[in-house]
Regions:
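Short N-terminal mixed-charge amphipathic segments
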Residues: 22-77
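N-terminal leader/targeting segments
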Residues: 14-15, 57
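Extracellular/luminal domains of secretory-pathway glycoproteins
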Residues: 2, 16, 20, 25, ...
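C-terminal charged interaction modules
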Residues: 101-140
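Aromatic-anchored, charged helix-turn/loop surface patch used as a conserved interaction hotspot
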Residues: 60-62, 66-114
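Extended, Lys/Arg-enriched charged tracts that mediate electrostatic binding to polyanionic substrates
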Residues: 3-5, 9-14
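Short runs of predominantly hydrophobic/aromatic residues within well-ordered alpha helices
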Residues: 53-56, 81, 85, 122-126, ...
Length: 140
């Protein structure tokens, strides 16, 4: 099932200036394609949104469709998504480093040179940070 959300048209009434297409490539694994009309080349430019970008667009599509339409109509969706994902990743990195700094088990693994255990604990702390900050990711 592919859903498409179109922006209001600009000069040509039969042509949407921006639109987003939902693509399901595996069960529970969505990706989105964002199309933006390039008037210089007279064709659409396409961006594929996956992972965090797709998660944010999915949230907007099903929880805040009016805001999604506003972003599409203003042709700001792609820049909005990139800005939110960058801010989220920066916050997750910062929170992960704070968690790692206070983790005694990680410090011990580092002193003993057990890099496999250190990497596993770091991934675990990153996952904790992502879970802690997920709600702020969706706040508009």
């Amino acid at each position: 099932m592919n859903n498409k959300v179109f922006s209001k048209t600009r000069a040509n009434p039969s042509l949407a200036y921006c639109y987003i297409e939902e693509c399901i490539n595996e069960p529970d694994n969505k990706m989105y394609r964002y199309y933006h009309w390039d008037s210089k080349h007279k064709m659409y430019s396409e961006r594929t949104l996956i992972m965090d970008e797709a998660r944010l667009v999915n949230y907007l599509m099903y929880q805040k469709p009016d805001y999604l339409m506003q972003l599409l109509n203003e042709c700001r969706l792609y820049s909005y998504v990139l800005r939110k994902v960058r801010a989220y990743n920066k916050a997750v990195d910062s929170q992960t480093s704070e968690l790692c700094k206070d983790d005694q088990e990680m410090q011990l693994a580092l002193r003993l040179g057990d890099m496999d255990k250190y990497a596993a604990l770091e991934r675990s702390n990153r996952h904790k940070a992502e879970e802690m900050l997920r709600d702020s990711f969706y706040a508009a």
